[in-house]
């Protein structure tokens, strides 16, 4: 199937929570994380804010239907990936990689020095996926105050402390 990556538009925002919910279904394969499939997702206002800033990209199928997205936010001289989700029926098609490539292009053009994210350390489609694309796992000290605050918040909402990690791709 043919896919296209483009900058997200305001009218896309209402469709994005359903994509994130679909992507979350993959966590049902991992009994200890199955609860994530039923957890809340980012709201429309979150997406609209990042779309307005120009740091939100969409993967769409040949019919122009949204099937994935990457939402990012500029934090000083880094671009932080807040969410990368691909609808379950469209996973394993290289869309996550293509969305990340678009974010890297944007980061270079915006004079960012790195991309950052937090993710699950041992879930195959999380940290191992990002590591294959050049992201490095950070120690607690290397993560810095901003990423440590995100990891702390993730613990507060129910993630086990040792299950999450911060990663960085230096440009």
Curated annotation (Swiss-Prot):
UniProt EC number: 2.3.1.-
Pfam families for this protein: Acetyltransf_1
Tagged with keyword Acyltransferase: yes
An annotated Gene Ontology molecular function: acyltransferase activity, transferring groups other than amino-acyl groups
Keyword annotations of the record: Acyltransferase, Transferase
Chain sites annotated for binding CoA: 84-86, 128-130
Annotated N-acetyltransferase domain residues: 3-162
UniProt-listed InterPro entries: Acyl_CoA_acyltransferase, GNAT_dom
EC class of the enzyme, as a word: transferase
Role description: Catalyzes the transfer of an acetyl group from acetyl coenzyme A (AcCoA) to an acceptor substrate and releases both CoA and the acetylated product. It can use a variety of substrates including spermidine, spermine and N(8)-acetylspermidine, 7-aminocephalosporanic acid, colistin and thiamine.
Name recorded for this polypeptide: Acetyltransferase PA2271
